Amino acid sequence: MTAPASKLLQPITVGPLELKNRIMFPPLTTGYEERDGSIGERSLAFYERLARGGVSYIVIGDVAPVMTASPTPKLATDAQIPTFKALADAVHKHGAKVALQLFHPEYDVPGVGRMVMGSMAAAKAAQEAKAAGDEETFAAKMAESNEIRNQAYAKLHHDMQHFVNEASVEQLIQIKEAIAASAARAQQAGIDAIEVHGDRLVGSLCSAILNQRTDEYGGSFENRVRYALEVVAAIKEAAPQLMVEYKLPVIMENPDGTPRGKGGLQPDEACEFAKLLEGAGIDMIQVAQANHTGNMGDTIPPMGAMPYNWTLPVAERVKALVSVPVATVGRVISVEAGEKILEDGAADIIAYGRSLMCDPDIALKAATGEPIRECLNCNKGCVDAIQNRKYISCVLNAENGDEATVAIKPGEGDKKIAVVGGGIAGLEAARVAAKRGYDVTVYEASDHLGGQIVLAAAPPRKDEIMRSVEYYEKILPGLGVKVELNHAATAEDLNAADAAIVAVGAHDVVIPVPGADSEKVVSSWDVLAGKAELTGRVAVIGGGLVGTETAEYLLQHGCEVAIVEMLDKIAAGESETILPLIMSDFAEHNVEQHVKTRLTAITDEGVEAIRTTEDGAEEPVKIACDYVVMAVGSKANAFDLDGVTVPVTCVGDCSGERTADIASAIRTAYHAANEL
């Protein structure tokens, strides 16, 4: 336990709203909405869970004011008002306020005017034809509009480099009017606030990089921000009862001093714009990373890519210039970090995005001093899901995304539970079983907890993953869980309990080729554990997640590396936000990548393999090396159940299912313990 927070829990007035604390959930694309864009059961359960956890202000991300193929929530017609009223009611029930982040998705493409305008133009022509009684033209134009709209998903999210005509002033007015109309509907639904999405279309107009217009919306700084201020004014006129917030995207700075993000405003311009926003009646400003185009890792960086709170310096500058509350967002992962930001006066409100997905009870725990489950910034369940058009979830939180149906059940009487294995699956099983009121003992054969997580934390930028283990080390004693290290569990140990969960993990494997028993062959696990110190030139067999991360580890320790992979690319399955960092590292160190290549033998000189060429032929390959590292997967460990008389459930890698990742380990353990 730590000391309860004080600053984070102080109320704050934002425009017409009184927020009960300084903790907000910023806008995130979730994928939870229904196909028609309405707020369904999954969305309601997710946002209500955040409110129940004590968050004071929740922003619903990417709400479209028009019907579109873009997979986002939509408030485009009066018929959609009831679902948003249900959302407002669910959040208000727990004392929180809710905002909608409005943006126009059919125009979410790089550059000013790089927008799909055909659907709107065709729909307008269709309505004109209908008014004139021309049913044939009406049908043809509606078909054309629908066809373009159906293609919008691909155009907006997969083919981000196409160029279309610059938007006309009339079209910009139509967009502004649609946003204002949606704000008016939000007011009718009982929503508390509107957040103007200052990136995307609005941000591209503000950007000196992207805005090449020569009319009243281009050229000078005043012209470039004109449209954004007009949108703010239109919202305030259409929904005068609502608080209006502006998300201010800024080009930040990478650790090496280079600009980070495409589009957006430079810091000096952002500060000037903040003063104009205050003059226009904005009630709150959220300073964020700009990323009008490109990899989402620019906006939501993975572990190790950026310092904690990297947007804070600009937020602090903005706060010094305006009197309205300023929020900061970006890798604030702990209660202590949020407290310090507020104590230093650098911001007024702390946005915990991924962190609240990981632990929705941050506010409640801040009041008691209970440790929170800190986000790893791995991006595996959240950002990667967004980029792959799936609904988001947190790898550490088995309930996230399924709040409507998944929760820890009350226990069924007094039970003793034996958990065999102190890796991540065993620790999660112990937590859930203890939360249900059971008497839990964890048996770990080694002298430490964490299992394969300890290995996963060894490569460059990956040390943050150890926070997942540290969380359990903090909370399990308070839940009454007994942990016995250096204790290989026996049948007697299990039989002393009422039920057992076995989470003994897996072991690495070796490809059985000639020479595989050579002293020059070592396992990736031994390398990452520090048991094998290699020098010189190393061939890593296997270019999957473990192989590429082991290669990075070896580069960090001064080795030359060649990777041999059977598939046609390396790092298959790696986070799309982490992959560019790996490939940059490999390019810098001239890592050889032998893809579509199968190991056949290990010799004194190195390795021999067969490569499949582009035309399907096979050719021999010889790669000279001093050491060979096997990184070709793992096989489930077996636990001797001879003599065990109590019910046993296997979870994680030893379950026989191909889990091999932290999310699967957590979820199999959670559900197994929840069914005891």
What are the functions of these language-model segments?
Residues 1-420, 424, 428-435, 439-440, ...:
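Flavin-dependent oxidoreductase catalytic cores
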Residues 10-12, 44-45, 271-272, 313-315, ...:
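A generic local structural motif
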Residues 285, 318, 341, 353, ...:
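Hydrophobic, well-ordered secondary-structure elements that form the walls
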Residues 322, 345-346, 479, 517, ...:
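Short, structured coil segments at secondary-structure junctions
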Residues 329, 397, 486-488, 524, ...:
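Conserved beta-strand termini and adjacent loop/short-helix elements that scaffold enzyme active sites
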Residues 411-445, 484-492, 496, 503-513, ...:
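Rossmann-like dinucleotide/flavin-binding elements
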Residues 439-479, 551-599, 655-658:
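Rossmann-like dinucleotide-binding cores of NAD(P)H-dependent redox enzymes
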Residues 607-611:
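SH3/SH3-like beta-barrel fold
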